[in-house]
């Protein structure tokens, strides 16, 4: 089995820092534009890029684990190319990812020296341990608000609510109980529509539950 992690909007492979340390031979992808290269403008575009990445490396028995936007990519992969995956793991995501205008506006008008946008990034990572917090913030500044906006706009257009029941791969769905961006009802919906999906709500976790409650998340992945 090859465990491949895909990060969320404006993120990077560092979103799975603790998972990479725990799961031997796993891989976390940096999507284009995060921070190098040009970002894709749609979830479909990111899907094809990820597919190209995994097939070029001849990964076999891939279990694709996606967080937030990465979860959207994983869902679409499972719907479009199910024979290429062994299973999917969805963390803090949904079958539809409508984005609150506050998040979009903060990216579009990030303030002088991106100060307004950076305040939002700090809020995202407030539950993360200090050993990784500063590293995450540095990477955020490298990715920047323009790429974050691009990704959130792609998420805002994502909607597979009419298709999600067609996923036939082994699926695990989890989220933090305090997640505001992708609330528990999103995870419950996925669990109700995907046949035999395993569902877990991690008590006390928020949107970056895999960083905040990494031991519990790793136990669930195992």
PLM region descriptions:
Residues 75, 79-80, 85-115:
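Flexible "cap/lid" loop of the alpha/beta hydrolase fold
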Residues 98-101, 113-166:
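Conserved alpha/beta-hydrolase catalytic His-Asp/Glu region
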Residues 167, 173-175, 179:
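Short beta-strand/loop motif that positions the catalytic acidic residue
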Residues 45-62:
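Conserved acidic catalytic loop of the alpha/beta-hydrolase fold
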Residues 66-70, 74:
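Gly/Ala-rich beta-loop-alpha elbow adjacent to hydrolase catalytic centers
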Residues 1-37:
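Conserved HGGG/HGGXW glycine-rich cap/lid loop of the alpha/beta-hydrolase fold
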């Amino acid at each position: 089995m090859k465990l491949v992690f895909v990060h969320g909007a404006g993120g990077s492979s560092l979103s799975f820092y603790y998972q990479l340390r725990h799961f031997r031979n796993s891989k976390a992808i940096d999507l284009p534009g995060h921070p190098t290269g040009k970002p894709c403008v749609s979830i479909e575009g990111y899907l094809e890029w990820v597919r190209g990445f995994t097939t070029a490396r001849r990964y076999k028995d891939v279990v694709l684990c996606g967080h937030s936007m990465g979860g959207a990519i994983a869902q679409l992969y499972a719907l479009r190319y199910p024979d290429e995956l062994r299973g999917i793991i969805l963390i803090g995501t949904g079958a539809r990812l409508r984005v609150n205008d506050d998040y979009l506006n903060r990216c579009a008008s990030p303030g002088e020296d991106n100060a307004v946008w950076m305040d939002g990034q700090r809020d995202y990572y407030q539950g993360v341990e200090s050993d990784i917090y500063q590293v995450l913030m540095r990477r955020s500044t490298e990715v920047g608000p323009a790429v974050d906006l691009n990704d959130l706009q792609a998420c805002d257009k994502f909607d597979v609510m009419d298709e999600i029941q067609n996923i036939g791969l082994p699926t695990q769905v989890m989220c933090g109980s305090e997640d505001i961006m992708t609330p528990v009802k999103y995870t419950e919906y996925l669990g109700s529509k995907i046949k035999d999906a395993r569902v877990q709500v991690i008590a006390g976790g928020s949107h970056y539950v895999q960083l905040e409650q990494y031991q519990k998340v790793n136990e669930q992945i195992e």
